[in-house]
From Swiss-Prot:
The modification N6-acetyllysine is found at K125. It comes from the Eukaryota. The modification N-acetylalanine is found at A2. GO terms for biological process: deadenylation-independent decapping of nuclear-transcribed mRNA. One of its GO terms (cellular component) is P-body. This is Enhancer of mRNA-decapping protein 4. The modification Phosphothreonine is found at T693, T727, T821. Residues 609-628, 677-689 have a biased composition (Low complexity). Residues 913-934 are annotated as: Sufficient for nuclear localization. Gene3D superfamilies: 6.10.140.270, conserved c-terminal region of ge- 1, YVTN repeat-like/Quinoprotein amine dehydrogenase. In the process of mRNA degradation, seems to play a role in mRNA decapping. Component of a complex containing DCP2 and DCP1A which functions in decapping of ARE-containing mRNAs. Promotes complex formation between DCP1A and DCP2. Enhances the catalytic activity of DCP2 (in vitro). Belongs to the WD repeat EDC4 family. It is found in: Cytoplasm, P-body; Nucleus.
Amino acid sequence: MASCASIDIEDATQHLRDILKLDRPAGGPSAESPRPSSAYNGDLNGLLVPDPLCSGDSTSANKTGLRTMPPINLQEKQVICLSGDDSSTCIGILAKEVEIVASSDSSISSKARGSNKVKIQPVAKYDWEQKYYYGNLIAVSNSFLAYAIRAANNGSAMVRVISVSTSERTLLKGFTGSVADLAFAHLNSPQLACLDEAGNLFVWRLALVNGKIQEEILVHIRQPEGTPLNHFRRIIWCPFIPEESEDCCEESSPTVALLHEDRAEVWDLDMLRSSHSTWPVDVSQIKQGFIVVKGHSTCLSEGALSPDGTVLATASHDGYVKFWQIYIEGQDEPRCLHEWKPHDGRPLSCLLFCDNHKKQDPDVPFWRFLITGADQNRELKMWCTVSWTCLQTIRFSPDIFSSVSVPPSLKVCLDLSAEYLILSDVQRKVLYVMELLQNQEEGHACFSSISEFLLTHPVLSFGIQVVSRCRLRHTEVLPAEEENDSLGADGTHGAGAMESAAGVLIKLFCVHTKALQDVQIRFQPQLNPDVVAPLPTHTAHEDFTFGESRPELGSEGLGSAAHGSQPDLRRIVELPAPADFLSLSSETKPKLMTPDAFMTPSASLQQITASPSSSSSGSSSSSSSSSSSLTAVSAMSSTSAVDPSLTRPPEELTLSPKLQLDGSLTMSSSGSLQASPRGLLPGLLPAPADKLTPKGPGQVPTATSALSLELQEVEPLGLPQASPSRTRSPDVISSASTALSQDIPEIASEALSRGFGSSAPEGLEPDSMASAASALHLLSPRPRPGPELGPQLGLDGGPGDGDRHNTPSLLEAALTQEASTPDSQVWPTAPDITRETCSTLAESPRNGLQEKHKSLAFHRPPYHLLQQRDSQDASAEQSDHDDEVASLASASGGFGTKVPAPRLPAKDWKTKGSPRTSPKLKRKSKKDDGDAAMGSRLTEHQVAEPPEDWPALIWQQQRELAELRHSQEELLQRLCTQLEGLQSTVTGHVERALETRHEQEQRRLERALAEGQQRGGQLQEQLTQQLSQALSSAVAGRLERSIRDEIKKTVPPCVSRSLEPMAGQLSNSVATKLTAVEGSMKENISKLLKSKNLTDAIARAAADTLQGPMQAAYREAFQSVVLPAFEKSCQAMFQQINDSFRLGTQEYLQQLESHMKSRKAREQEAREPVLAQLRGLVSTLQSATEQMAATVAGSVRAEVQHQLHVAVGSLQESILAQVQRIVKGEVSVALKEQQAAVTSSIMQAMRSAAGTPVPSAHLDCQAQQAHILQLLQQGHLNQAFQQALTAADLNLVLYVCETVDPAQVFGQPPCPLSQPVLLSLIQQLASDLGTRTDLKLSYLEEAVMHLDHSDPITRDHMGSVMAQVRQKLFQFLQAEPHNSLGKAARRLSLMLHGLVTPSLP
């Protein structure tokens, strides 16, 4: 491998620019290598689906998508404190160095609820360990979903694959250790790559065949056995760019990069498959098709491949990012093109290139901007790869005021359009979405906003599926399928499009600690009032189609560039050069305040205080006073329509300002402005449409203003009035999005073709028709009286509304049909079940809603919980809700009750005004009854032609109108009376029938419980048969089978649910009683056995019974058997012992005597020669000792004399040098003191002689130190500190603080320092806490404690000084959060807060 040091850096950088085409002008043509219009991102697993709102001509969309943006005044620094609620959405980022402080509600221990803008659908339940995973746990494509798990029995690693469309599942096995990383080639690719901790590579091709998932192994590369496990391994796919002529994009790039601990490997899968046919293959057997890149000192963390596969970018924990030129087919070694440390050598954890792979512009170069992250992405930086300069820095920090401050651990992912960066915190239950803006021409890129969304659990890993533009309803609860229903096949808007706003939809699959979930986030992005144009208004005759105006809507109506084009950044100005967070430039150097500044009242403080962070309470006219800037951030309101009676002027809607630290501390508002929860009710709001338009200068056009624009053209719509609690409650909103809202699209499509009508009828009585109309308002198109029904009901339409009233609504059609029927008999309609049983419908889902969900064209994938699939399938099939109501109403006749009013058959109920009737049945009934309506329309057409006899015709028409009004009033009265009677009768019958049936079932259940749990199944079958027989006699023939099916589906679950608690109670009661009996028996038996009376009685009885026989038996046995035998045995034993002892003693004495004699003889023989030798040795030793003593004495005497001579000489030299040094030091000190004294006397003489005093700033520093030292030695502490503080030199103040101990200064009962000196000392010591922090903090604590609050000067100046000190302490804590002195700094900050708060006005 070529060495990096031997390559010229400039040549390598230029070569890298040539490869990436970074030096090419942005607007220049690129005919040599035109790029296709779409691309893929391997890191994000592929391609996004196109946006339905922005499809069309890409050229026109790009042209209209470019917007003129005003320049942003970027600041140096900004601190954003998130609040944890839904108001933390789209908070503007206005600086190049931004610190984002996490909210306290996002912590795991917080009880805060999740965000209302996030919708969660569980996919699978599994417990993942909460830790930071360097790889991905999940991979997402358009067809499949793959995630890593472990087996429950042996803990082996597996990958679960789920089909998104059919929920079919399969398992992929064969891994060693855990799965380190997995990824699809792109969203439309079926190729899944997995890498385990041992480095084994698996590549499968997935396919759905006959409803089953078939997996085919494409590549399996096996590492040698014994390879150490490492969880830092990563998979990087090469972004695949198909040719423009290709229709299918399911094929993927053959190049993939593997990041190991010490190296990176780039593999060509096509070459591997061509050279090997069987798998697995050991890596040692592969000779071609890969290349190895080495050059980092520690493990690799991230990487990226260029689209052409010739450049590899790697990031490592050693802090380096390196670019390598690679050629797999050739023999050239990888060459390092460029390297640099983006985060000052800290470990890197993120490497993202901001390329728009969703729709790539051929004129835009790749790898123009780069995002890097360090320390688990706690710090993010935006880089320009042309100049290698940092454009923006984002830092994430924990809440410093929280009791447990856990540093963030962020997982980041960039969407394919490079417009949104999504982050999840492993240590917090939160998701962040940051908006990214780019300007290729100017070379600028930055993050423009951040949004916070709270979750219920932390996200460990996630995969992005869709990031697209959408239309947000005013309730913000409808899912994407129903929002997309507002666009028909011909491009026609639905009814909900007029009440929508531009928004962003993000679909994710997230791995939480407890489950895998499908997460959808909808929010309104940050809008610029100068850029966003209002939605185009339409007259009553216009058809709501897009047609040629669709590109304009995508670029202007949505407030963003069309999909596929790079976002325009003309409003971004030149970003300044990066600077340290706490560095002080020449303009921002703090001015040190002398004690004289605190001797004046507060009026003069404005002329002295120049620090930008200090706040003054004086007059605003002073030019030198600076007040903290206040930035109020509020969420954009997305409520429905505003009641004109409840609207407020703009000046009344105020927000409490938040403190902004260090330039622009942006606080997100804890709440959002809520509009009136009322809907627009016809008749209740007769005000004209122009009063509904909110007024006020500079108002941002939100969803409310967009709706107001619509209300200027359209009369108030007929909507049911919503209660305030239902409007505000997130639970009600969530339930509404999954229940009632899914029935609207089919019916709303009919209402769309009719146009918008005028105000609702005012002549209707609210008590009689409000219930029926409210039910029809929920599920039918907006009712408006037609030209035929208007005269009958006595309604006066507004001017110009006649051409919009040609088509009647469902309620009007029913009333017209009844009014035009020749038969005089009036039949009542079905009761308003939606009004009476709303609580029941809200708690238990009805059958009609579930069947209508299945009929929708757009629906979410039918995910099922893996552990609850069988239980959920049991209740999947149910019948229509109207059939259930009809069956209950008909069955009431079989229990002995009578209905006084005649009833319609069930068929007529479904065709004459039931609010649950499907649109198909309504259309069928309209077709059958169309003769009367057609006749009335023909009559109107004829009337429209001017006849000759106008007066007669007018008189005849007036008479007919009067008759029609009279007949209509009578009809309405009869209809209301019969409706009320029928509702009360049916309600009473149903209640009595349910009570009777409940009593019978209760008795049967009690008998069943008495017989036992084993006969439960048989009893359920008998109850089902009895119920079927009882109901079949009272129900009509057409409803018999539906009722039987309903009973089979409803009664057994109810019986089983009723049996289970009763059986549980019975078993619990029996077990409780048995436990009590057992405990009492044990207690009684133990007491009985432990009773002394019982024991004594048993002992006495046994003793009395056994005493006599036992004594006689023992006595006889002992005397006859034991004694004789024992005497004989003892006698024989003693005799044997005596004989043996006597013989042994004699033999021992004989042997001892012989041995002693022989031993004595041998010792005498050996002693004689030893004695002779000892005598000779003693004489020899004496002579040698005498000679040695004489020799040693002479040598010792000579050596002692020599050593004494040497030691005395060296001692003289050392004593001389020491005396010289001491004398020299003492003389120098004395001379310095003399010089200081002389200088002081000279200066005093000069001051007394001169007319003006000499400024102390001109004194020499050494002279000042000498004078201060003299004052300290004399005990004048106040004068010494005052002279040092007056010099305005922080080094001189530190010299005094180091010289004098704090205990010596503040230990005296009256503090020797005056109050101005104390205030000046506090201000100067707090100006810079970066050096000698321990000394400064100790003096600051003592000085703050000795401030006199009763002193007027101290009370006047203490507020501003303490505020400045608190700000400096906050900056110190932010800059050095892990400093050992952080605890003392926090304690001092809390002390200052307690001192300042009571004194503030």
